[in-house]
């Protein structure tokens, strides 16, 4: 055996650097990386726990405020039809008829669903009023979440941690603001009767809250879905009242301040101009001329070409959907993100 060992090739010892062999250095490198990962997880663990606790209490207090508003409005709502337009809205909703111009088709359909829950015709006005009371309570809920979101963002912008004291300060501010609006005379007056302003206020509060949700997730890959959802809800709100269009300037300013690193007076001026142009585009072009153009095509197809009624408006709707869909797809394929969002938002509004 000694002779055989002498004939075997000699393996040189691996080079040693800093007192460590290559294998040991690799083990120490992995060990260092694992230690860093654990340190980061340990540092972020209290923050994650605090955010989960904040979100839990934010939901609990928010729904408690909603319950206070809902019970208040349901306890004080009009038992029957009240003065002004409420009687007309209740009657047209129950029979799905046409109300006074410019109309409120979405309100009529939602109120019709509410009247179907009435045990008899005597309770039809009560069900419409109850629907408005619940819509007003949801407006208060979204207002509470809006205030708490802004309060939490103020603390985070100042570099301060969300301690228990800060958390309850934010929740208290949201409760005070939401409940103060709950018992205001103007809002309470419209919350217990069958008018369109309660449902319109709910859409307004929902749209603003969703825009703040986008603001919090603006750097994530799929954050634009919030903007598309907002456009869809604004399109629905047109079927209740066009008052919701007044949210557009606020949404534009939130987008500008979130996406701009350096805020200037010129940028603020351009944001004002763009928001005004969007209001004019939706209110003076999309709302009236989309229906008018479809009616003109239908008249041409029926009176000139002798085609069946609604053939022109059907073809117009299909061409509009296909055209906007193809344009949005082409913008997506070419990487035109902003153009794609604009086209999708326009489609949702329509």
Located regions from the model:
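Short hydrophobic alpha-helices at membrane interfaces in multi-pass membrane enzymes
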Residues: 172-175, 210, 217-235, 264-277
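Transmembrane signal-anchor helices characteristic of membrane glycosylation enzymes that use polyprenol
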Residues: 55-83, 181-183, 241, 279-284, ...
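Membrane-interfacial entry segments at the cytosolic side of transmembrane helices
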Residues: 222-225, 261-273, 305-314, 330-346
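Aromatic- and kink-enriched transmembrane "portal" helix at the membrane-lumen/periplasm boundary
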Residues: 74-75, 121-129, 156-170, 174-201, ...
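Extracytoplasmic catalytic/substrate-binding loops of multi-pass membrane glycan-assembly enzymes
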Residues: 77-89, 99-111, 126
């Amino acid at each position: 055996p000694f002779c055989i060992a002498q004939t075997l090739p000699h393996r040189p010892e691996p080079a040693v650097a800093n007192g460590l062999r290559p294998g040991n250095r690799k083990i120490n490198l992995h060990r260092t990386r694992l230690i860093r990962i654990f340190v980061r997880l340990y540092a972020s663990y209290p923050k994650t726990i605090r955010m989960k606790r904040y979100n839990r209490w934010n939901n609990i207090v928010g729904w408690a405020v909603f319950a206070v508003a809902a019970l208040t409005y349901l306890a004080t709502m009009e038992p029957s039809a009240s003065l002004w337009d409420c009687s007309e809205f209740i009657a047209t909703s129950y029979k799905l008829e046409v109300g006074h111009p410019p109309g409120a088709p979405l309100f009529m359909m939602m109120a019709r669903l509410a009247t179907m829950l009435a045990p008899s015709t005597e309770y039809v006005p009560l069900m419409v009023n109850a629907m408005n009371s619940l819509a007003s309570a949801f407006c208060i809920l979204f207002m509470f979440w809006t205030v708490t979101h802004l309060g939490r963002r103020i603390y985070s912008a100042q570099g301060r941690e969300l301690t228990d004291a800060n958390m309850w300060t934010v929740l208290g501010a949201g409760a005070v603001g939401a409940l103060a609006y709950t018992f205001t005379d103007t809002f309470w007056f419209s919350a217990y009767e069958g008018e369109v302003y309660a449902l319109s206020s709910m859409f307004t509060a929902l749209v603003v809250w969703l825009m703040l949700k986008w603001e919090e997730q603006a750097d994530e890959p799929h954050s634009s879905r919030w903007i598309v959802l907002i456009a869809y809800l604004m399109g629905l709100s047109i079927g209740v009242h066009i008052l919701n269009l007044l949210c557009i300037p606020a949404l534009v300013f939130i987008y500008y301040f979130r996406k701009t690193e350096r805020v200037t007076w010129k940028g603020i001026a351009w944001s004002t101009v763009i928001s005004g142009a969007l209001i004019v585009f939706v209110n003076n072009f999309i709302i009236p001329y989309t229906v008018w153009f479809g009616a003109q095509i239908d008249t041409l197809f029926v009176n000139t070409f002798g085609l069946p009624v609604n053939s022109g408006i059907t073809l117009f709707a299909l061409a509009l959907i296909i055209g906007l869909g193809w344009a949005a797809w082409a913008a997506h394929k070419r990487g035109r993100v902003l153009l794609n969002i604009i086209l999708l938002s326009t489609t949702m509004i329509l």
